[in-house]
């Protein structure tokens, strides 16, 4: 296992630089913020009585986990967030009602930030969704860490790290499920909404930890030299977060950090397939080819036959793309010592994960699937093809600077190789506004846009009742796959998915 070795590579603005005997590749002419490899704490015990500012409490558990962790280690903790106490009520209620916490060491500054909280702190714990550049609060901080950097600095677990644009959450879920079923005492954390600080005290040098990394979480590790995964997986790369990065080269530059400090004792798993037209590296070839040239680890390519390939007869989760995610999980399980046939048997019982084509309800023969984690158009387009027959699609929302062509071409029938939805229901939002002209031009019938889930589901119920009276055939799946962000109507994609499932169950009993 790789453990927490000293960094042997250096990351500097605008390029990924390995040792001189390794490949050199200039990624893009931009400035990336590089963090210090030094930590403000010499040890976990050194946290006691330090002043910690947690930048961002949030509703997904990351800020809450950091507050709990540092309080448990005897620190003085200040939690600050731009959101108000009313907006953060669920998280605050959990913290304030927990009698095991030392509330005399906990302070809240909500509804805005105070520069003094950053200037006076021994360490600031940063939210990954906050850019360093141009942020006066971070610029005033003596030291900046994240929940992931703290976990990686002070543990020596074998890390299985996964990033990518499509399929990373499903892949980590399948890996974690497989490890547990194979008898490993494994843990899962990261971008899948579980902070690794929640299980910090439960791991040791033999505990496999599966971590999903967003590009932002990886960017927050640049220069620290703490991420040395025994196994690194990069799932399919497609345009994402282009409203943040502005171009694919900068976006992928952060993804590439996942393997920057691997060694020849480690494994890298990359795509062998083609990138979508116009989305590959400026230097030519594919992203998978580039990754394979750069990493020092042993390379395994998926989307091609290898010694680790498994032929899945069936999976509980629908879609060919889910078979690819399961294949990556099968490869990881084999690298961890699980026999190939056993890996196949385990993964064929994998139930999938919440908010990813999650079957959750049946009403009058109609099966309902929650795919709220589909925040990019390509994911929603894939969901329409996952069942091998036309679906009733509930989609739309707020766009984030992405091309909508892949989804629009399915909806308006331009993609002749794809199954067009049997019916379309649209949530209001800027992404929906960009889809509508193509649908109108093609004379596609659609419902909406609706300003709320309740309005959309009310119309859907009426239509399904009418269809049930007229149609005795097998009912089409009803799939909620927005292909857009949740912001505006919901706190995040998980809040959106939970509210969708609750609304469906309440309305369709």
Question: What kind of feature is each model-predicted range?
Answer:
Residues 35, 43-51, 69-73, 315-421:
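Nucleotide phosphate-binding/pyrophosphate-handling subdomain across enzymes
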Residues 91-98, 404-477:
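C-terminal helical cap/extension that packs against the catalytic core
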Residues 30-146, 427:
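N-terminal leader/targeting and accessory segments in enzymes
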Residues 75-83, 268-272, 394-395, 420-429:
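Short internal beta-strands
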